[in-house]
Amino acid sequence: MVVEFKNEPGYDFSVQENVDMFKKALKDVEKELGQDIPLVINGEKIFKDDKIKSINPADTSQVIANASKATKQDVEDAFKAANEAYKSWKTWSANDRAELMLRVSAIIRRRKAEIAAIMVYEAGKPWDEAVGDAAEGIDFIEYYARSMMDLAQGKPVLDREGEHNKYFYKSIGTGVTIPPWNFPFAIMAGTTLAPVVAGNIVLLKPAEDTPYIAYKLMGILEEAGLPKGVVNFVPGDPKEIGDYLVDHKDTHFVTFTGSRATGTRIYERSAVVQEGQNFLKRVIAEMGGKDAIVVDENIDTDMAAEAIVTSAFGFSGQKCSACSRAIVHKDVYDEVLEKSIKLTKELTLGNTVDNTYMGPVINKKQFDKIKNYIEIGKEEGKLEQGGGTDDSKGYFVEPTIISGLKSKDRIMQEEIFGPVVGFVKVNDFDEAIEVANDTDYGLTGAVITNNREHWIKAVNEFDVGNLYLNRGCTSAVVGYHPFGGFKMSGTDAKTGSPDYLLHFLEQKVVSEMF
């Protein structure tokens, strides 16, 4: 009997026993770093001479892994293996597939500290964030397994005299998962195994910055007994194999999390019907945000400042849900800004192995991009806090606050994906909502208010997929906060929702006459 879903807990690091346990996990993981990792096609491990080097963004001298780089021929071999595996996998019952996924999640649960420790090194994640990432991966797998069980019998439709009708779901085929580096386990595992539990086959192309943690999932899937070829692991250069994966005539769906530029490219290319393709491809894309916290008048300014700072600087602002815009009523603007600066000064920045609040940004390209935006911010507004950068050993950017901005400034319009938040002053709540909606994105947002009428207005008019009252705009929880956004934030395919698996299923109707 499958027990009721409940979220996987993290570790309480105020308890010394948990601190000691996680330090041991970090030491154990460090001993294994630097190894070569293969492609995995039809269960076969294939080592290639050409490699992708994964490094610790907090200490660029430390190599995490050398991932074999797939070629187009490797991808072609993976599609052949996938199509063969599909013949058998699609015949498994929904319950059998779901039960196997529950076994996967049980293995991850036992290895949660190890999985989290890897992300501390490979993604520069702080301890709490890394553990939360691992726990969220478990949540996704557990939630989707139960969702598939719920969908197993289809949905009721009407019969009539002499006619019996059935409405049920069937799998689609082979697809491609392209996950991000910022949630290298949770999103990677969720977007890979959601289609799998629905009866499909996946080619997994991990993020170039975080292939090692994705390879660890492959080992767990093998241990759990997933048949060969159901998930094929093809790390590689997106310039070499990215379009090939998306364009392939056997790609039935693409799940992507990443930049707007790449997401729109995938969307466009997926619309083209290739020779030998007799179906329309599905794209499930999450492409980022320019998320805002709106602060009304007559509110708890301490709560507002805390919401802004934690949402802006958690994991160094490298969340698609991170607060990059603080839109504050003129009556409390100065006080909220001052308190936000004070809280920001208390944050620790450094190598996350040492359990700092903030760690590095992921790579040199992001470091340079964020550094450039800070300079733009200095021109458009006033640098209130932070702004410093240091790439002498790792890619470190201080938590940065820029005030005195206008809605059309680049700092307020363009996704930075780093620890930078801009403040803009507004005259009233109507203007605040106008400014909040004044971007191409619509992922998350939050409103700090004690005015119920204003909250109702925000619910109706704040154009985001996930809206929160009197809290920050990050930290969606599987089962409670199905996650996905509007406009250029993506296709609003709500992860962790009762509807998510429908993206990987076809609906079939069978009518039998008597």
From Swiss-Prot:
Record: active site: 286, 320
Keyword Oxidoreductase: yes
InterPro entries: Ald_DH/histidinol_DH, Ald_DH_C, Ald_DH_CS_CYS, Ald_DH_CS_GLU, Ald_DH_N, Aldehyde_DH_dom, Proline_metab_enzyme, RocA
UniProt keyword Oxidoreductase, yes or no: yes
Gene Ontology cellular component terms for the protein in this record: cytoplasmic side of plasma membrane
Pfam family, one: Aldedh
Family the UniProt entry places it in: Belongs to the aldehyde dehydrogenase family. RocA subfamily.
Protein known as: 1-pyrroline-5-carboxylate dehydrogenase
Organism: Staphylococcus aureus (strain MSSA476)
Record lineage: Bacteria, Bacillati, Bacillota, Bacilli, Bacillales
